[in-house]
Structure formats: structure tokens, C-alpha cells
């Protein structure tokens, strides 16, 4: 399962997020794969693609950040998969 995670940094402040990342890493449990991410120019939001087979791994990861990040989770598919489904 691929998911697009939209992270809204609490109070629009990325500093606590990047400080924790430097200190503790991504905090992703075994089985949750980071694919890639992009951050808005104003550093208020991050768009991140993650992959896992077990939704509870994603929930565990989000719980480790939920005090400083608000999350939106959107299931996604690749363009190739979308084309196949649309045929």
C-alpha cells in the first residue's frame, strides 16, 4: 500500500520536527518504507510518500510525531496502476 502523507507542522513551525529528526531519525518501525518527500517553500507542510502492507505500522509512526505534526493520509497508486485500472 502506498500512501501520501501530508504533514502540517504544528503552528507552521518546522524547527521541532527537524530537531527530532536529527536527534532520533525517522522513527519508522520495521516494515514501513519511506519513499520520498517534498516540503513547501514556506516550510509549513511536508508531502511524503510511504509504503507498507500493515496500516498499524503507519499509525505507530504517526503516533511518534503527533505532538508536533498533524497528518492527512491519502491512499495512492502509481500512474501505471491507475492506467491499468482505468482500462
Predicted regions: what is each one?
Residues 68-79:
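Conserved short beta-strand edge segments in small beta-sheet-based binding/regulatory domains
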Residues 1-35, 39-45, 53-57, 77-87:
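Short S/T/G/P-rich N-terminal loop/turn motif that feeds into the first structured element of a domain
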Residues 58-65:
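Short, electropositive alpha-helical surface patch
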Residues 13-14, 67-69:
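A short local loop/turn or secondary-structure capping micro-motif enriched for an aromatic residue
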Residues 51-52, 64:
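Conserved catalytic core of Hanks-type protein kinase domains
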